């Protein structure tokens, strides 16, 4: 379930924290993906025929999760992402009552699905089919095997996958968490990516507008959320518990807006309980908000030293055997997927320019480029001055020689007249007006982008000069 109404509340109250991005914006980024959520989406989305049944092999076993996972992973890699899949471990004890409720809802949906099939109600069949889906242990193991054979890193969380994903961003081992569960923000993920598998469905179920707009994702920035809501992380956690989470019941009569106002006034749940009118707001008898809070602050996750992220070469022959022989995939289709996989691996090895600079130095990319360009200008300025001085000397000698010839003629005609002195004003070269001022770079440069504004200055600095000097700058600052 995640946090009830959280995304909408953030969109309304802290709109700067949410933005739409294209998948290209994540090129070169490591993204920690909630594997269980992805498998659930694939099983729901990829259907066969009008009865909305899962894709199956000859043995009657579901293969929608395998087909979707393989296709989507390759697509992400083709767009330059480096996916890490994180699988759920044992569910926390606090989640027991929530899981029971989900089981009851699933059972009811199965009954409604049987009735819809008897009546031939296709719309109801589609609706209830999605509600009956659950990812089995066997499907999880098959997904892990597939990813391992593809050479994709797999991490098994001791508990909640989204919590482990969030901590990977805290460890700076991943850029973002990809899941539909907003509680990843409460676990502290720096960036939350939603809709990563939005286009995972078959052609029949695809959104026709998605291809026109491109592959659009939703990005939520936790730092901007806290800034926009003007809450500390501890206050944000208590706010989310009051909104409604998987770990405990909540106070009846309190929605997201009321919860936010109460947190702003009283700062924490303890103070809220002391001050609210309990006739108006019914506090649960066994309100385990303290345990829920601790589950968000200190969830069961692997420590940084325990996390092993291995990018391996695909095991092609084993992958073919797994797909073709064990799950009856079409051989031509599998060959096509493997060809795409091998090509996509080359794309994921490309590094982002900004991450390269970040790992080298704490200076910003803009500052490094500006400093490097100034060094180029300084060198060129010195060279230009030398040329001007040499040119001046040559012209001075020529003028002196010319003057001496004139003087000699005059001396021959008028011996009594003194020799003429060369006019110093004639020696001054009009090219001196173009002597380069080193400070001109700062005046003629766009401080935001580092691009040179003045075309004349731009002619003095060729793009090849700058690109040749930047690697030297990089080498100088690498630790």
UniProtKB/Swiss-Prot annotation:
Stretches for region I-domain: 124-266
Pfam families in the record: XPG_I, XPG_N
Q: Which cofactor does it need?
A: Mg(2+)
Tell me which residues bind DNA: 47, 72, 160, 244, 246
Q: What CDD domains does the record tag this protein with?
A: H3TH_FEN1-Euk, PIN_FEN1
Instruction: Provide the binding site for Mg(2+) 2.
Output: 181, 183, 246
Entry keywords, A to Z: DNA damage, DNA repair, DNA replication, Endonuclease, Exonuclease, Hydrolase, Magnesium, Metal-binding, Mitochondrion, Nuclease, Nucleus, Phosphoprotein
GO terms (molecular function) for this protein are: 5'-3' exonuclease activity; 5'-flap endonuclease activity; DNA binding; magnesium ion binding
Please share the entry's free-text remark on the cofactor: Binds 2 magnesium ions per subunit. They probably participate in the reaction catalyzed by the enzyme. May bind an additional third magnesium ion after substrate binding.
Family the UniProt entry places it in = Belongs to the XPG/RAD2 endonuclease family. FEN1 subfamily.
Supply the name of the protein.
Flap endonuclease 1
Q: Which organism is it from?
A: Plasmodium berghei (strain Anka)
